[in-house]
């Protein structure tokens, strides 16, 4: 009964956190999608940690589905990659995708083990 409320509250805070991280990163790295990289890598670690922590179902809804669902972004990653490809920034897009996927999986694994 409370599940949608937990997801909505977590989603609100996740969206706000993503906005703040993205604005901060854009000022520091205007030519590279640092904000998206940060939220996706941090989100991978935190979701792994949550999964390993044995958290209650309500916490998983609030933090995992709500906060992390709004904080991380799959579609922006893809669109930024397409933009780099359109600009023929091949090295940059390879580094971006490799860092996102390889480091993301490793950080999820690490977070899971830290959470245990």
From Swiss-Prot:
Fluoride-specific ion channel. Important for reducing fluoride concentration in the cell, thus reducing its toxicity. NCBIfam families: crcB, PRK14205.1. One of its GO terms (biological process) is cellular detoxification of fluoride. It is found in: Cell membrane. Keywords: Cell membrane, Ion channel, Ion transport, Membrane, Metal-binding, Sodium, Transmembrane, Transmembrane helix, Transport. Its main location: membrane. Pfam families: CRCB (PF02537). It comes from Geobacillus kaustophilus (strain HTA426). One of its GO terms (molecular function) is metal ion binding. It is a multi-pass membrane protein. It catalyses: fluoride(in) = fluoride(out). This is Fluoride-specific ion channel FluC 1. Na(+) is not transported, but it plays an essential structural role and its presence is essential for fluoride channel function. Na(+) binds at residues 69, 72. GO terms for cellular component: plasma membrane. The keyword Zinc does not apply. The keyword RNA-binding does not apply. Belongs to the fluoride channel Fluc/FEX (TC 1.A.43) family. The chain crosses the membrane at residues 1-21, 32-52, 54-74, 93-113.
